Amino acid sequence: MAENQKVDLSTLPKGLTKEEFTALPNFKKIRAFFTWAGVVSIVSGIFVLSSIGHLSQSILQNGGSLDGLFQMGAVKLNLLFMVVSIVLGILLIKKKTTTMAYILAIIELIYVLLAITSGGSVGIGAISFLLSLVGAIRIDKKWKLYQEISV
């Protein structure tokens, strides 16, 4: 089957689980959304860590202490999102399931909304959100059609 042709769901084996369905070679291009969403999420986490590092360096150069920095709620929240972004990115790359993609999309949406309200940068989080959501929605649409056909 050519890569650019639509998948004829009626030719697929009956009784597949959602994980087996998602893992079919026919959906390799859609699963690529999950891989890229995971990579972008990991990069997003690294950028957050980098920005906290730059902020810490600035504070230390100006004679401040890091105790005050890490007591700030925004810094703690950014550290939490950094860890969550990296962990979810790794899990999405490894598992490539729609559930993981939706979880990552929700987390990134929350992060984007928090960044907007605090005047931060939303570019990378928004990209990860969109990649996760697009991949998960495309697989779920095909999964629902497959379930209707295989009944």
Regions found by a protein language model. Name each.
Residues 2-151:
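Topology signature of small-to-medium multi-pass alpha-helical membrane proteins
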